[in-house]
Amino acid sequence: LLASSAASDVYKRQVIKFTVALTAFLLINHNIGYMEKISSTPIALILALICSILPVGGAVFIGSVLILLDMYALSVEVCIVALILFILMYILYFRFSPKNEYGVLLTPICFGLNIPFVMPVGMGLLRELYSMFSLVCGIVLYFFLNGVKQNETTLGGVDEKDAATSKIVVALNQLLGNREMYLVLAIMVVTLVIVYIIRKMSIEHAWAVAIIFGILFEAVGMIAGDMVLGISGKTITILVGSIISCVIAFVIQFLFFNLDYSRTERLQFEDDEYYYYVKAVPKAIVAGTDKKVTRFSGKEEQDRMTKKRFAEEMEIDEDLLD
């Protein structure tokens, strides 16, 4: 049974990696597929199959190569700017957030699907604070590529006098002069921090509260920020994207943190040095009769337990008792 379960997990991971990689490659081909030889669906399928047997970082690397080739087909100057950007991103990524490859891939994908708000909420629920660096990389990458797409006529024009310098300035301006990108970076990073802090709190329905606060902060912040920057026509998109992101976030909660608060147990016990007061909330997928809960009192010296024994008895992480 264990072998069968392990094999099933391997296949599931491969399917997930294939799906994410294929979606990323198809979006690259659709939006910036300037090199026609590599911008076909069969090529995307083959590369996604290769990525399914590689670590997730393999998809990030292959996606970077595809983008650089497309940028080269558009303009050598844009390719150089993109290469410098990727080098800086890889330094930031490998230094602070090497185990959050999905964040780098999924963030531009979610932007392309108009549901970017799910990323800071989802990462705040499932990851640690340092995952914000992969989120930042994904946001910067999306806005750079989107800016290149919007200015492809200028960037892909025939070389003229001073044209090379002009192309570099236009490419750099997609990053350095993009006020909307700075707005999105600030709001999404703060959202991730808010969601992370709330879901760590010892309150009932912490994940649900974190999701609601996070989505509301993003929606209100983006609408207000767009008004300040004079960006119009995005309110409906923001509201619809927020609703869809909220639904996805609650699906994440159901899959990873589905608790039954109606069966909450408050426990007290002691060891030689401390008294412990613990609130134990069972998972909703576990039947009430499947778990035996033993209550410990300071008056029952024979039932004293160390934190380690208690954690083993309750099948919880010992660190949760700290």
Whereabouts are the PLM-identified features?
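Membrane-interface helix-loop-helix junctions at boundaries between adjacent transmembrane segments
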Residues: 49, 62-136
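Alpha-helical transmembrane segments of multi-pass integral membrane proteins
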Residues: 13, 23-26, 40, 226-279
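Structural signature of hydrophobic alpha-helical transmembrane segments
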Residues: 35-38, 71-84, 178-186
